[in-house]
Amino acid sequence: MAGHSKWANIQHRKGRVDAQRGKMWSKLSKAIIVSAKMGGGDPSLNIRLRKAIDDAKAVSMPKDNIERAIKRGTGELDGDAVEEVLYEGYGPGGVAVMCLALTDNRNRTAPELRTMFGKFGGELGKTGCVSYLFERKGIFVFGEGADEEKVTELALENGADDVEVDEDGKVQVTCSPEAFSDLEVAFDEAGMDTEVSEVTQIASTNVDLDESVSGKVLALLEALDDHDDIQTVSTNANFPSESVSE
């Protein structure tokens, strides 16, 4: 899981800067729309929607924007349909990359991602080209200084598969997608804040990168992460510590 943990840490630091610029509003609006469409417009009954709303509030997204997104998801307001699409490809050095997009226009998103992959030395592939290298997992990352014993106890009581502490002292919990909601509720009720909380694609095995390639891979991943339609980016790349600390 080390490769995912390092990339997740980079995303978390970068996300704080993005939030200050308001760049997350478009992404979060789509997340709210899809969450409301899948589970209804009541956040007290729809944990995924509640998390999307909390994320939106954390970056000062206006209340009216949030309410409009919910109503688009429930069908109370008209708008282009937003759907989840999983894109797969290869980065520099042949590393595997998977991107979860929320898009209202596949004919726009796919060409843009194809161009982006090519610009950074990669290639957008066909469905199934790298997905066999990943498993769909829930993941929670707690910052340095988190109570490892308390995290572990709650995690194991609520269906987690594994608890690890990475080299930066961060506690990482992984679980099946089915156990994600129970764990999310347990951590929330215990007042335990997470740096990362999502269901994503986790590589079964990681590919170690040297410095000559890691910078190119990071440039691609960060560009993909910046795209308005992309919600999560996963890779099987394992970055040198020097790359993560930059």
Curated annotation (Swiss-Prot):
Its main location: cytoplasm. The keyword NADP does not apply. One of its GO terms (cellular component) is cytosol. It is found in: Cytoplasm. It holds the Pfam family Transcrip_reg. GO terms for molecular function: DNA binding. Belongs to the TACO1 family. NCBIfam families: PRK00110.1, PRK12378.1, YebC/PmpR family DNA-binding transcriptional regulator. This is Probable transcriptional regulatory protein RB5500.
